[in-house]
Amino acid sequence: MNLRIFLVVASLVLSVLLGLVLGQRGGGAPQAAAGDARVVIGLSLDTLEEARWRADRDIFVARANGLGAEVVVLAANGDDTTQVGDVEKLLTRGIDVLVIVPHDGKAMAKAVRMAHDAGVPVIAYDRIVRDSPLDLYVSFDNVRVGELQARYLVDHLPTPGRGRIVRIYGARSDNNAALFKAGQDRVLAPYLERGDITVVHEDWAEEWKPENAKRIVNAAITASGPRFDAVLASNDGTAGGAVQALLEEGLAGRVLVTGQDAETVALQRIAAGTQAMTIYKPLGSLARGAAELAVKLARRSVVVAPRAVDNGATAVPSVLFDVVTVTRDNLLDTVVADGFATYDDVYRGIPEAARPPRPGT
């Protein structure tokens, strides 16, 4: 029996109805009938060690449960072999749709093929799976994230548009790291070509680990001394490692540091002045939206996918959510107003007299 999943890929002028056929080739998992049977979603996560992913999981599960679906969650602790094994377990369990946050976007192509062999559609969550016949990609506009990081840095150098910087990329295995870099490159290119901005040191922070980011900043200081104006860090974890290195050199608060994810510790650094900005990615919208889309795919309903992203094998129907730049000036109007973080959490460690008025007072 063939299983047909319909996705509407919309543009400014037209909508195209795509019928993506997943052949159930032997031993397929039982599929949810449209609108009646209870949907079972398999959620395969790279890791739950970071607070960000625990938040995604909780919001996703709550929304899916609210729609009458069951979610089976497995986390691979950053190991590709474990994650492939997790997918095998989920397929054996009899899931109707697989949602995967890949540790390695290329390695998990095998997991997509396994799911399709079992007649199960696959959604890549936040990180795309490369070189695979992926059914749907749900994420943020990650090139835009990099553009916003670099634009803020350029505009807020001591002399706007001129300076010496350190660049910290993310994990090479994470396709998002390449997208963030592409967005940064797009903004920085003319300044680098003119020689207005100089990159004194750059490297990849493998596994996104703060300690690797700290080593990159330490290497920059060893190579060129503390003569740089900013650190273009690609997320809040690497920003934290950069800030630690700067603290040890007495440079924290004097060197601009970027970030991403609006982690609580990063918001606290922004309030304290040791990190300049972060990118707020409304996880609630992403996780709830992905849960809704997963249920629709499991029930063979029409899904509207306004974008398409090339994963090396196909143009994957994609739903990309927008992001917001957060600085000390708009903490209250963004993450606090949205309920993403509390006033007390953000300003913990800041003397009462130095805090802005509490909302509602």
Model-flagged regions — what are they?
Residues 2-361:
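A residue-level marker of the well-folded mature domains of exported/periplasmic proteins
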